[in-house]
């Protein structure tokens, strides 16, 4: 009887472990982070929540990472349980507050717990660049990429749009990187963390021709060598990208945009 009860307890414990979300905790804690409330990152593999994991790894701040490995629906169910109105990744529990929007979360963590790291000083000439790219990443770049993706998946393009398109927004980044090593200016910053996701989307989904943007490619190569990003991938993307969108069969032809009617 006792043996059977022990066996049942062991099986129950194994079942609980199998069903539980994967939890990872940062191995290092930066001195002075004691005032930070507990941070739990609710994550979907290969999505924007990776930015917050990367940020915490760069800063050496403690966090818990919650997702169901290889199960996007299961991970989303965990997010929906704590954020039912706008379930999205990242959803971050910061003490007793629920936070969304990766850019806002990055700014909050850097302002309160970054100790001056990953962000130019207020009087730095690099601060305007940093702020532009922090917001350009989602406000212009990602927005245009996904808009073009939906349109081009429905009807593959024959000519470039007369409006700002995916090639134009990536070219803006390419031109900036011709004169600056990082999107925050002289040093790696939160702006670089913001920009990696949409620039990977641009090439992975065949929205642009990667060969046209050597400065972006060189920047990506530097980024991929960062130890904090490697740790992030080990923890937050252990099996590689899952559930990704299909690549476009073709993108708009490169070159000048078509003229606007009447111009």
Q: Where is each model-derived feature located?
A:
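N-terminal secretory signal peptides and thylakoid transit peptides that target proteins
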Residues: 1-17
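C-terminal segment of N-terminal export signals and the immediately downstream linker at the start
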Residues: 3, 22-37
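Short, structured helix-loop boundary elements
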Residues: 7-8, 76, 127, 163, ...
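GST-like domain detector, emphasizing the conserved glutathione-binding G-site
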Residues: 31-160, 262
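Conserved beta-strand edge residues that scaffold enzyme active sites
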Residues: 69-72, 191, 237
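GST-like fold's C-terminal all-alpha helical module
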Residues: 133-225
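A late-sequence structural motif
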Residues: 226, 231-232
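Acidic/histidine-enriched, glycine/proline-rich intrinsically disordered or flexible terminal extensions
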Residues: 236-263
